Swiss-Prot record:
Protein's gene: CER1
First-listed, main subcellular location of the protein, grouped into a coarse class: endoplasmic reticulum
Source species: Arabidopsis thaliana
Protein name: Very-long-chain aldehyde decarbonylase CER1
Keyword Nucleotide-binding: no
Subunit (UniProt): Homodimer. Interacts with CER3, CYTB5-B, CYTB5-C, CYTB5-D and CYTB5-E.
Membership in a protein family: Belongs to the sterol desaturase family.
Amino acid sequence: MATKPGVLTDWPWTPLGSFKYIVIAPWAVHSTYRFVTDDPEKRDLGYFLVFPFLLFRILHNQVWISLSRYYTSSGKRRIVDKGIDFNQVDRETNWDDQILFNGVLFYIGINLLPEAKQLPWWRTDGVLMAALIHTGPVEFLYYWLHKALHHHFLYSRYHSHHHSSIVTEPITSVIHPFAEHIAYFILFAIPLLTTLLTKTASIISFAGYIIYIDFMNNMGHCNFELIPKRLFHLFPPLKFLCYTPSYHSLHHTQFRTNYSLFMPLYDYIYGTMDESTDTLYEKTLERGDDIVDVVHLTHLTTPESIYHLRIGLASFASYPFAYRWFMRLLWPFTSLSMIFTLFYARLFVAERNSFNKLNLQSWVIPRYNLQYLLKWRKEAINNMIEKAILEADKKGVKVLSLGLMNQGEELNRNGEVYIHNHPDMKVRLVDGSRLAAAVVINSVPKATTSVVMTGNLTKVAYTIASALCQRGVQVSTLRLDEYEKIRSCVPQECRDHLVYLTSEALSSNKVWLVGEGTTREEQEKATKGTLFIPFSQFPLKQLRRDCIYHTTPALIVPKSLVNVHSCENWLPRKAMSATRVAGILHALEGWEMHECGTSLLLSDLDQVWEACLSHGFQPLLLPHH
């Protein structure tokens, strides 16, 4: 929102929320109906193609968003290092409004202007005319309109909304108040209306011009440099006709320079080109990948989780993962992504953060939960994890944390296999079990004297049970085999606090520590108001409305941890899994040992918890009933 929002700041359909697409629905239905029912010789192909073209523009913009987030994660050719936050993502979540607005105007124009009906596919003279008009009047008028928008009166009421994003993403290009978009549409309509009135318009000239605007807008705000220097060497005048991402980035960091739309010619003419333009361009081109201190190695969970990655759907990734209705419409892309990940065996960088001079990255292995459970896939997945560890070691990474199923006991003995295979590697492996156990223990209400533990037992579960028994808390199990397994791990002097519980004695236990494999029947046995606290990496399915469900082991990150603008799987905003935080703590504290394998480290739980709090990480608040 602008500093002092002016008239026509909000879009007309803002009150409709996610139902705003109903605005375009009647036109889309009408154009399709006309195309199907009209005589083939009288069909208006241009009218029919408006809606598919709008969908193409959405896809085009999304491709740019994903590319930008992918390249800026690694650091190569990144222009501005400063991170973005959830406020920026929320502010830019309505980037499709301008496509909706254009679509409505296109439909109205085709119905009102006889010249806009039944356009041919191609007219060379119309394409040349549109290009010349854009180079002259459009670029010239935009330059002065842009300068006017930087006057205090208009800037505070309108244009400051756009400049709220100092670090730009491709969609930042279209984040303006409604009034500005009206002005821009009038400006960009000049070439289109001219070709219509001169009867030189064509479907290609209309679509091509709009795609050109979208492409240049996205490129100019993508925050990584992609125009090679040799293009300007081969054709020096191109410097005046085509801007670069670093050129426009200076406008967002310096504000009073580089006003031109796409052609720097007018900044050269009027003396508003930033003096550091060429220096920044060359410096950015030479920039390599970031030097990384801590890597969190995770993987995809479900086919739909690809959209929840930071490089996926930006607004969707900014909220905890939940299956949404629109995912059914995306099944063609979901299927393609599944096929792609089947053959694409390389991990990729999904996210970067920084904290206390540490550079952090999240790497993703393109495999799903189901594939980790298949015995015949375990060797291949282990090889991928091992390659990731060796790559991190080669790059000088200090700590690598194994997230989700990358640290499975059956898969690699909680990471111990890699230490055995590569005893000389310098990177330290962390499974996060100490911190995860500490988080669960400190999530148990202070006055609790007894807890129920059930589900598939893990290293974390054994650690929690042993620690609670040592503290005098009674740990009850529902299954005899669980009781025997935990008993073998609990120190002998504390075994009196371990109980095999019958169903009749459950009423006094209001705290349940649960893992994967907890059944519906077991949940139903819990009394009303029970608090379920997961000790597993994956959340418990919430079947009881009369009970309280805690998140998986996680912590709220301190404000000094920057570039946090997406949610980690099902966790709330500004929360990180205990495994991921454990890797960061390992580097901050300078601990030299590996923290993985099957051994329990009961004596270190208080140490890791105190270190966590001292660095500003905070436990998640208990969810409201």
